[in-house]
Amino acid sequence: MWPPTSITPFNPFQIPLLNTIILISSGVSVTWAHHAIMENNNSQMTQGLFITIILGIYFTILQAYEYFEAPFTIADSIYGSTFFMATGFHGLHVIIGTLFLLICLIRHLNNHFSSNHHFGFEAAAWYWHFVDVVWLFLYISIYWWGN
C-alpha cells in the first residue's frame, strides 16, 4: 500500500502543483533570457534571468513551507524517508541552480557575456532545464501517484 495507511500525503493540486507551475514558468523565463542574449538584447536578458532567479527562490520558500507543514517526518515510514530525501535532494539542486543563475546575472551585468560568448549562462540554463524535468518526475511519482 502506497503511501502507508498511517501517512496523510499532500494534496497534489495545492502547493505541489503551484511549485510545478513555478518551475515550468522559470524554464520559459530562462529560455527567454537565452534567446535575448543571442539577439544581443541585454535588457530582456536581465529581465528573464531576474524572473528565473525570483521563481527559483519562490520555489525554495514554498518547499521549505511544505516541509514545516508536513504531517509526517523523515522517520515516520519509508514514504517519509523517500519524500524528504527525493524532494530535499531536488531542492538542493534548485538552490545550486539559483546560485548559478545569480552568478550569471552578475556576470551579465558586468558585461562578461555577449551573443557569441555566453557558455557559462548556457550551461546554467541547461542545468536549470534538467532540474525542471526531474521535478516533473518527482511531482508525478511522489505527489500524484503517492496520493
UniProtKB/Swiss-Prot annotation:
InterPro entries: Cyt_c/ubiquinol_Oxase_su3, Cyt_c_oxase_su3_dom, Cyt_c_oxidase-like_su3, Cyt_c_oxidase_su3-like_sf, Cyt_c_oxidase_su3_a-hlx. One of its GO terms (cellular component) is mitochondrial inner membrane. Its EC number is 7.1.1.9. It catalyses: 4 Fe(II)-[cytochrome c] + O2 + 8 H(+)(in) = 4 Fe(III)-[cytochrome c] + 2 H2O + 4 H(+)(out). The chain crosses the membrane at residues 13-33, 48-68, 83-103, 125-145. It is a multi-pass membrane protein. It is found in: Mitochondrion inner membrane. PROSITE patterns: COX3. Pfam families: COX3. GO terms for biological process: mitochondrial electron transport, cytochrome c to oxygen. Keywords: Membrane, Mitochondrion, Mitochondrion inner membrane, Translocase, Transmembrane, Transmembrane helix. Belongs to the cytochrome c oxidase subunit 3 family. Component of the cytochrome c oxidase (complex IV, CIV), a multisubunit enzyme composed of a catalytic core of 3 subunits and several supernumerary subunits. The complex exists as a monomer or a dimer and forms supercomplexes (SCs) in the inner mitochondrial membrane with ubiquinol-cytochrome c oxidoreductase (cytochrome b-c1 complex, complex III, CIII). This is Cytochrome c oxidase subunit 3. It comes from Spodoptera frugiperda (Fall armyworm).
